[in-house]
Amino acid sequence: MAKKNQLTTSEHLDYQEYERLLQCLHDDGEYKWEMYARLSFCTACRVSDVIQFKWHHILNVPSVNVTEKKTGKTRTIPINPSVQKKFREMYILLGRPDMKDYVLPSTQGDKPITIQRINQKLKWFKSKYRLKIDNFSTHTFRKTFGRYVYETSNRSAESLLLLNKILNHHSIQTTKAYIGITQDEINGIFNSIQF
């Protein structure tokens, strides 16, 4: 695990593995961590933004406005009815916290959880649930979102353009590297051409 302010390399989870993680967390009553995984995926936000969410920001709203800490850019993220419903279910499972509370509180409650603590727990969940991922960190769910969009859009160039905008990357190359598109995958596309 990286130390504070140290760069890390993380990977995306295959979507089926992501769903398995959600089910394991749910079955074990790890609702706070299930909520973290869902919120990170559904918003595609960086962890520095995710930990700032309070319940009134995300519950029973059609969209979330986020001013990204890293870029200073503001994004409006739609929260579709299915996601709204799941967030309400999680809110109830978490004991209906005050709407002004952080979704992911620290043990003190009046502050959000730390990024270091999240990474510690993710490392623990990786081991406990035997997740098929080498580098599991706070960036994993954002990358999983990106890979999910790319895969469900049939690996289209349009999906890369959309992801580039959603993730606020400076270039398509950054987006490709971010979601784990490898040279082998690119070669595979060219090698699949048949006449």
Language-model features: where?
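Basic, Lys/Arg- and aromatic-enriched nucleic-acid-binding interface segment
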Residues: 2, 15-43
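DNA/chromatin major-groove-contacting recognition/catalytic segments
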Residues: 9, 82, 156, 180-195
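Short pre-functional
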Residues: 34-46, 64, 147-152
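Active-site-proximal segment of tyrosine recombinases
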Residues: 49-50, 146, 154-168
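Conserved tyrosine-mediated DNA breakage-rejoining catalytic core shared by Y-recombinases
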Residues: 52-83
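Catalytic-site neighborhood detector that most strongly recognizes the C-terminal catalytic loop/helix
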Residues: 68-71, 167-192
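Active-site/catalytic core of tyrosine-dependent DNA strand-transfer enzymes
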Residues: 82-133
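Short basic/aromatic active-site micro-motif
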Residues: 133-152
